[in-house]
Curated annotation (Swiss-Prot):
It comes from Exiguobacterium sibiricum (strain DSM 17290 / CCUG 55495 / CIP 109462 / JCM 13490 / 255-15). The keyword Metal-binding applies. Belongs to the phosphohexose mutase family. One of its GO terms (biological process) is UDP-N-acetylglucosamine biosynthetic process. Keywords: Isomerase, Magnesium, Metal-binding, Phosphoprotein. Its cofactor is Mg(2+). The gene is glmM. The active site is at 101 (phosphoserine intermediate). The modification Phosphoserine is found at residue 101. This is Phosphoglucosamine mutase.
Amino acid sequence: MGKYFGTDGVRGVANVELTPELAYRLGRTGGYVLTKHESTRPKVLIGRDTRVSGQMLENALIAGLLSIGAEVMRLGVISTPGVAYLTKTMDATAGVMISASHNPVEDNGIKFFGSDGFKLDDATELEIEGLLDEAEDTLPRPSGKELGFVHDYYEGAQKYLHMLRQTSDEDFSGIHVAIDGAHGATSSLAPRLFGDLEAEVSTIGTTPNGLNINEGVGSTHPEHLADFVLEKGADVGLSFDGDGDRLIAIDENGKIVDGDKIMFICGKYLNEIGRLKDNTIVATVMSNLGFHKTVAEHGMTALQTAVGDRYVVEEMRKNNYTLGGEQSGHIIFMDYSTTGDGMLSGVQLLQIMKATGKKLSELAAEMPVFPQRLVNIRVSDKNGAMNGPAVQAIIAEVEAEMAGNGRILVRASGTEPLVRVMAEAPTQEACDMYVERIANVVRENYALQEN
């Protein structure tokens, strides 16, 4: 990670850390780096989620892009994977998404995609950072007819939804789906998509007002959708995050089906129909031990990467793997998309339910899970906390006690000032004990307040 770019673009408190001035400079520097080799006028697509700060940052970013001569196509409110898909399929030079995903409304972020629809590599981000830190802006300043221009392309969302519909061989008639749009980017898109596929649709979290994104709703609060599924008697619940790149599902009994289970269900089905490249699923170190055991029992291989969907995608691209993802709900179907896509994951999950005739609870029950506990601690110095001798000592002590019968993972968040402490063990009581012992040491030495 660099000075400005984290694991998922540039993020911060809008108008405090991520200011319109910084957005303008990102438009100029990012636009220049991504378009400098173009022989014709570069075309850049911009989408955003529903945050109140989105329009402020969008306008500043557009001004920067226009100042280096780009044509800007404004997509309006759309999901992150929607921007990635349209960037790739419309021969755009670059795409930009303005969102802080599952973060609270005060935050926002700016994420760039290359012309291939993939997030930028580290070298490109560092080149942009170098220009941001230059004392003087010496980038080209075209004038007259060479200046850029902007126009709206709101029909891009319909083109993206059409692609999603085409990924299913089944219609979803007879399936009642409950949708939680997190008051975010999928609020209008997801009900339209699943309605077009003939599902019966009930919704919560689909009335954004600029301030309520992720507020008690969405994939980080799936318990609310679980209650709604039971209330409506739905067959399945689909909970998206603010920018629509992740999915947490709910079965008909109100039980949460996380990214690990979704990956297993989809991987098993794809393997059975001969569409899982090398029988391999790419996951991260956060995936449950139960996921790894069950994947192996079904004749598949699970590879591990660092946490972050960019690292999953990186590994997938090396060997053209077709399925990967994270426990948090980022699922990548490389046959269709270049990034995690919550709505695409939902379509694939419902297609499997329809094709197999099985309830989601039946599909999910094939993968048992080890009890797991995750605690987030807001800290003053996440790197210092990770490397502190007291923290390292308690981690070593707990791992020795586990003696291989479970695991501990302590890591710094890539997008927030948090240290995450996770444990898996044969019992929930053991999980809780191990996590609290480590978390208490982190709190005593580095905590600001617990999240």
